[in-house]
Regions:
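Residue-level signature of outer-membrane beta-barrel architecture
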Residues: 108, 147-151, 208, 265-268, ...
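Repeated loop/turn-to-beta-strand initiation elements of outer-membrane beta-barrel proteins
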Residues: 115, 152-157, 212-216, 270-274, ...
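Residues that define the transmembrane beta-barrel architecture of outer-membrane proteins
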Residues: 113, 135-143, 196-202, 256-262, ...
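N-terminal periplasmic/intermembrane-space "pro-region" immediately following the signal or transit peptide
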Residues: 25-120, 124, 133-134, 146-155, ...
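Outer-membrane beta-barrel "beta-signal"
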Residues: 424, 458-477
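Transmembrane beta-strands of outer-membrane beta-barrel pores
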Residues: 121-129, 162-168, 220-226, 268-270, ...
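Outer membrane beta-barrel transmembrane domains
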Residues: 316-326, 353-367, 372-376, 384-433, ...
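Surface-exposed coil loops of outer-membrane beta-barrel proteins
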Residues: 169-303
């Protein structure tokens, strides 16, 4: 079935072609597997993990928490403080991660500028059981180029993030049982997940060093990620091999692609507080466009990185008219999360990342409250093996009962059920192509729901996803 689909469609091949083009890019940039990145006066083309400690650079020893390689007058180490982690900007938007979080990046130095690139793509085959289950071959991807330089008493970062999802996910959705929260072509998407926008982020960030331990940050993006929630699921290391959106996505981190975003952040030692203004309406089915609008929504987030392996956040946001089908309805969202990351044997053997997330939406004016809980964990062991799990407990609304039907007149969202999802997966990667990791794997998801939903979903709904995964990697990995 997969071979027949690929032969008859150009779209999944676009995803593969884009990832295979990365070696040419890597030939220009060099590569780095790093914990975090920032400006450095490195050679014209360098394979490195960069730290803000430019003045003391001598040599570099590679492991998941620290990279080393002999280079003239340079020592490049991983961030040792939260301020350095912020300056790295290896996460989407202004989200924070534990300092020890590893990232694969391609890098180059051109004059005062440091250029970076990282990205990943999946070619997926999804099969699900039950009356509502669907089968589909589709691609998911994101690519992030970034550039940094010193400017005045601070650092300027410009960044783009793009996805081929609008081309590789036909019909503006892929099947995912019990997923709700989006619309396309005037109808709700039920038991399916929408593609990401082609423009996921176009942002400029200026970090002004007020003192050794104090940083004032300005973030502006016609499309970007406001200060809401944890690191969005496509970019979390704890979800690096699970390409499907969590069922709680629209109660936790769905605003990671928002329009007209401005954020102000102040960090001191291990803590940071941020406030954002942005346009609250979620994107519609026109996924190739930037859908600008007035800044009508706000958020605030407090982040704490007490040690190099831990990061936590709490955020609150008011979303003005986020849903196209419910234009008179606003949402108050609260989230809290904790992420733990641990390099295994100092990174020589692998890495283990775990995230816990709680998200809550309260819709107004009816004051309905919906909660979601997530625990996910991914372990990379023996360097080329990945095992992961995601466990969720989420509230679902009566949108589930609509199926593919339009919203009827006078419809009001109400709680209908609490759903549990249990996912377990494994993949193994090979480095057939320079600077490209290729992995083949799969995952199994079992859902539990109240017996009242058995006539719609069957008694034991489940899904199986198999995939090929491509990721830009350093040549030495």
């Amino acid at each position: 079935m997969m071979a027949r689909y690929i032969a008859g469609s150009k779209y999944p091949i676009l995803l593969t072609a884009a990832l295979l083009a990365a070696p040419a890019f890597a030939g220009e940039l060099g590569a780095s597997s790093c914990t975090s990145l920032n400006l450095c006066p490195c050679s014209d083309v360098a394979t490195t993990s960069v730290s803000v400690q430019q003045s003391s650079m001598q040599s570099m020893s590679q492991n998941a928490g620290q990279m080393t390689m002999s280079m003239p007058n340079m020592k490049m180490t991983a961030p040792t403080t939260f301020i350095e982690e912020i300056l790295a900007h290896s996460a989407a938007g202004t989200a924070a991660e534990p300092n020890s979080t590893p990232h694969d990046m391609l890098m180059a130095q051109r004059g005062a500028w440091t250029f970076m690139f990282h990205g990943v793509g999946f070619l997926n085959s999804q099969q699900q059981t039950g009356p509502r289950g669907g089968d589909k071959v589709f691609g998911t991807s994101w690519f992030m180029p970034m550039a940094q330089r010193d400017l005045g008493n601070g650092t300027l970062t410009v960044r783009g993030m793009f996805s081929l999802d609008p081309a590789t996910i036909t019909g503006r959705q892929y099947p995912e049982l019990f997923q709700v929260g989006e619309t396309a072509f005037g109808k709700p998407i039920v038991d399916g997940q929408h593609p990401h926008n082609f423009f996921m982020e176009l942002a400029a960030i200026y970090d002004w060093k007020l003192a050794k331990d104090t940083l004032l940050s300005f973030y502006a993006a016609p499309v970007g990620d406001p200060a809401i929630g944890p690191e969005a699921f496509p970019h979390r290391v704890s979800a690096s091999e699970d390409t499907l959106a969590p069922l709680g996505h629209h109660l936790q981190d769905s605003t990671h692609i928002a329009d007209d975003v401005v954020t102000l952040g102040l960090a001191y030692k291990i803590a940071r507080i941020e406030v954002s203004g942005f346009h609250g309406r979620e994107p519609n089915e026109h996924r190739w466009e930037i859908q600008a609008g007035a800044i009508d929504s706000w958020s605030a987030r407090f982040t704490l990185n007490p040690t190099k392996d831990w990061s936590g956040q709490y955020s609150i946001t008011h979303l003005t008219s986020p849903e196209q089908l419910f234009p008179s309805e606003d949402t108050l969202r609260m989230t809290a999360s904790v992420t733990y990351n641990k390099p295994l044997r100092d990174g020589a053997w692998g890495n283990w990342a775990t995230t816990l997330v709680w998200g809550r939406n309260r819709n107004s004016p009816d004051a309905e409250i919906f909660n979601s809980y997530l625990a996910e964990s991914t372990a990379r062991f023996a360097n080329h093996n990945y095992a992961w799990t995601r466990i969720e407990n989420v509230d679902r609304t009566n949108e589930l009962l609509l199926g593919e039907n339009p919203i009827p007149p006078g419809f009001q969202e109400r709680f209908v059920a609490r759903i549990q999802a249990y996912t377990f997966g494994y993949d193994h990667e090979w480095n057939f192509i320079r600077h490209i990791s290729t992995a083949f794997g799969g995952q199994y998801t079992l859902y539990t729901a109240p017996p009242s939903l058995d006539p719609i979903y069957g008694s034991h709904p489940m899904g199986v996803l198999t995939f090929l995964r491509f990721r830009a990697i350093p040549s030495e990995k």
